[in-house]
Amino acid sequence: MVKISEIARTSTFAWSSKNLPLLAAGTVAGAVDINFSSSATLELWDIFSPTNKTEPIFSATVDNRFYALAWSKPFEGRPQGLLAGAFENGTVEFWDADVLIKTKDLAKASVHKSNKHTGAVKSLQFNPIQNHVLVTGGSNGQIFIWDTKTFSEPFAPGQAMTPMDEITSVSWNNSVSHILASTGNGGYTSIWDLKTKREVLHLSYTGAGGRANFSYVSWHPSQSTKLITASDNDSCPLILTWDLRNSNAPEKILEGHKKGVLSLDWCKQDPTLLLSSGKDNSTFLWNPIEGIKLGEYPTTANWAFETKFAPAAPDIFATASFDGKVVVQTIQDTSPSVSTKVASTDDNEFWSELSTTETQQPVFEVKQAPNWLKNPSNVSFGFGSKLVIINTDSSGKSTVKVDKFVAKGQEKTEKLFKDLKNDNYSSLIQDKLEGETVNENNKSDWEVLKRLSETGKESLFEDANNDEKEATSPETKKENGEDDFFEHLGNGETAKKEEVFVPEGNFKIFTNNENEDSKKLINLILRNKTEEAVSSCLEQKKLVEALVLALDGSDDVKQQVKNAYFKKNKENNLSRVIYNASTKNVTDLVAHANVENWKEVAVGISSFTTDSSEYNSKMSELGDRILKAKDGKRNDAVVCYLAGGALDKISNLWLQELPDYESELLSLKSEEITSPSDARLQALTNFVEKVATYRYITKSTGEFSGPMVEPLAKAILEFVNLVAGSGDFDLANKFLQLLPSEFSGTEKERILKATSKAVEPASAVKSSANAKIAKPASSSGQTRASINAVPAPAYAPPVQAPPVQAPQPPLVQQQQQQQQQQQPNRYGYAQPTYAGAAPKTNPYARTNPYAPSNNIYKPASPVATPSSLSGTTSGVPPPPPKASYKHETEGWNDLPDTFKAKTAAPRRAAAAATPPVSTPTPVSAPAFGSPGQPPSAPSQPGSVGSVSSAGYPKKTFSATNVLPPPPKSISRSTSRTTVPTSSTVPASPKPTPVSNKYAPAVTSDASQPPSSGFASPTLNSSPRLAKNPYAPSVTEQLPPKISYATPPAHHLANNGPSTPSYAPPKNPYAVPPSTSVSHAGIAPPPPAPKLGSAAPPPPQPFGSSMSMPVQPAFNGVPPPPPPVGRAVSTPAAAKIEQPPAREPELPVQSKHPKGDRTHIPENSLPIYNSLTNVLEAIKPNIPEKYAKHGTDMEQRLNILFDHLNNEEISNGVIELLLKVATSLESKDFANATAVNLQIATEHSDEIGNWHTGLKRLITMAEAMY
């Protein structure tokens, strides 16, 4: 039960027949009001209103109180039916419900009023078949039939066999319109036939508790011969079901009420549901067909005198009681238990919550689903356009038939598949242009695709050269019919030569009026000092002379003159064009040229770009500029995108236009398009056809790719779902091959199963992909399975055998699993670790929205490299990771995409305040029998002991574990969210060694670690790393700070059941492993598997190579060091002593209390005022589903205001915040976003929890301000 509403009235009520019904309530007669008031009211309640369910939508005072109310179904002239009231003074009044609701005037709504009854009217009901016919019953045994269309004189149904003093209930038969029943205080129930106008049957019952005094009667919802009665005798509180074909005795007797039953209601939609209420203050739900009680609803404080289902919403019912309440609730109980509602641990709070919490809950003895929740049909649609039909013959045998269902539009998808299969795209394009293209944009797209398919990219910009006139060549002359060149071979010049300058006559070096600068210039020229001469020309602003001199000069001189020319003519459009041509770089042309001349810019891109990738990039950039221009033409941008191969961008543009395309399809009123789903399928088909045609024209192969591929992939996946649902599996599968595996895996598996083809589980596909990526690394999972399941053969090459480990507590196991993740292969290709290197990630893996995003502004963390154990290793750097298709760099609680602007600039996460930490990488044993592994070399000093040829381990183990010196404390400014840590590191005790009865016998001569907690590394402990000038020195790093962020998804491993879902933070008090020769350098062995089973593989990041050191799960925190001094000995439980907890440091006290705004400086006050105004403007518009986001945003903004009030924000940030506030008030959201990003990048040490709130305010304001 879920309580929907509670009306504080002592009223009788009636439901309207709407799906979301109204409730009419009238003050009930015979009850004393809590205020001892004698007034009476008639009210209408909209209990399903989302805004106002606590107040009536209509209320009016009436002269007398009601015994009953009835609300008819709509009929002729009454669009919302009639509301009838039975008054205690014998009056029956009728109101037009439609007029009453619209005018809120009781007098205007009244259509008839009658005093035909001589006493109180106790009951009335409208006929369920003839909605305008009403029956009323009351004192003196009077029963009248009313015709509410004409309001003619009401008539009695006939003469009663045994007259009764009072009629308490009347009820119409639900199947036969002229049959009704009445009951009263005479102890019997009468059945009346209006055709014969007489009482035809007489029902009574006497049981062990005495004679039943019938108080209520109700007919079966669908069977005309069955009805039910209730007795209000406290000694005989029974509910009796009757079949009139045997009226001598009741069919079922329902016992459960402890006192008399006052009301019944038989559900019209489900005959197996019956409500009852009575003098014992209870309301029961029954199955009257089986005669069993289903459940009991919370009791009231006084008699529950009326209960009724809502006619059109039977899962809702109302109960009225004399304790002054009408409770509306659901028949199903979905409310939480009382223990979850009252969960306070404080005694005072517990009693306070208990007193205000609804503690009563329904109790159901039998669980039964109502009919409206059951499947009403024996026909069902199946995946792949299948129709399953179940038929039952006369003998009761069922047959199942599976047919093919041909949906609308399936012919088009079949034709599309044929065209794709036969590469018949020219026919597809022609059909699109000849058919109905719906709108001009779609037609233009197909025309461009046609030109592109026929003449290539060059034809798209041919109009840019229409004004050029080519010079007439000799070949042209010959074609035009002029004389041949050879006819005049000996008669004259074969071609016109250019005139060459030949100096003539005498001249003076210096004229009479020559100035000194000119003389100096001439002297420099005569001395062949070209560079100085050019500089002198430029000083004298003789640019032409400088250009001529530079022709014979060096490249530097030419560049000098060019720069002078371009600076002098920087405002000249020809100069800008010459600059782009001179530099052979069209970046300036693409970025700043007016987009009105986009075709000329495109020609320039074609002329000066050197490779296809640069050409595509510039064309795509030009398309972006055209699309963003105020008067930008969409079709011009489409041409640039198509020419530049920007399928992801052009597809996004097409996807944005899909809703309009669907609306236009629906407006055509075609026979093929009759519903929005038909329009959606055709729009998606048209989109897919354009994508497929473009890929064919440009000879694109492989999967979809690009930075904006996600919307394209989702649209293709939607199309695949639709056509696969129609049974076009081949077409769906063809497009699934083009999708990245991140999108197509599950759907591909589903289609392959539907077509009964062999299917490889998605998990196996991913695992094989990971195996390819991590090929050089050892598979510790295989190692463990091999060593534990099969003994090593005698002729096998010597390999290292890790000791088998006894079961460990969950925390220890997890620490060991983390270390095993980071163990490189001794004999594989060692990959060098660089400062700031990050683990490889799978580009298709789902991003964890709760993990902190990688920050490109964070200083790179230098990573310590372990010392070489034995032999020589060659370093092969890992390939660069492929860019992920999903750039999910938002915070965990950012707004959904609904509030995000479509053209918002990409945002980067702020730099983290935690300093990088140098992390030693542990060493692992090679995989047993791993392919591609060379045989192990003989054991050398400082290496892990190897297994002999007989397969038994040697007795000695040694390793060198080298750690960098301890970090020194340095002074560094931290963010306000930084957690202070102590630099004290107490010693950690050595854990007790454990053994495993399944491990081979091993003895150990392990030396004890030295007393010193730290040791200097050897000079040759690691290869020399390239120094990063921006990374902090290894010797100047703070102790690691514990960050309690959830680990990223690509670091989460497939842990066993006992492994927590997060990695434990490093113990800041633990002593690093010793550098002496001991067992400390040996990587912890895997947990021992159960007998007879192979050990599970170690957890590893999805899509990352095992030879790469895995970053710790916590941001900036290295994994815990391996256990010190582990050895194999007699069985013992592993004990881990916890270091003493240090006292937490007291937080820094703020200058002013939280919430104080009186100390905000003048220069910061506009920030507070503007942001507050915007916040208050959008708060009322925030949808209810995003209310938590709005509350969180306001709390974070208050943190910013507190910082402003305490003057804790630098002037640089304040200036940028002023720009954000100004941009928000002027609704320049793009600029506000850009400035907010600038704050994150330039002042990362100052942004704290408030920055996310500011970002959300900008996003919400863009949607609602």
UniProtKB/Swiss-Prot annotation:
The keyword Repeat applies. It is a peripheral membrane protein. It is found in: Cytoplasmic vesicle, COPII-coated vesicle membrane; Endoplasmic reticulum membrane. GO terms for molecular function: structural molecule activity. Residues 1004-1023 have a biased composition (Polar residues). WD repeats lie at residues 6-46, 61-105, 116-156, 162-202, 209-252, 256-296, 299-339, 380-403. Gene3D superfamilies: 1.25.40.1030, Functional domain of the splicing factor Prp18, YVTN repeat-like/Quinoprotein amine dehydrogenase. It comes from the Eukaryota. Residues 794-810, 1062-1071, 1083-1101 have a biased composition (Pro residues). The COPII coat is composed of at least 5 proteins: the SEC23/24 complex, the SEC13/31 complex, and the protein SAR1. SEC13 and SEC31 make a 2:2 tetramer that forms the edge element of the COPII outer coat. The tetramer self-assembles in multiple copies to form the complete polyhedral cage. Interacts (via WD 8) with SEC13. Belongs to the WD repeat SEC31 family. Component of the coat protein complex II (COPII) which promotes the formation of transport vesicles from the endoplasmic reticulum (ER). The coat has two main functions, the physical deformation of the endoplasmic reticulum membrane into vesicles and the selection of cargo molecules. This is Protein transport protein SEC31. It comes from Candida albicans (strain SC5314 / ATCC MYA-2876).
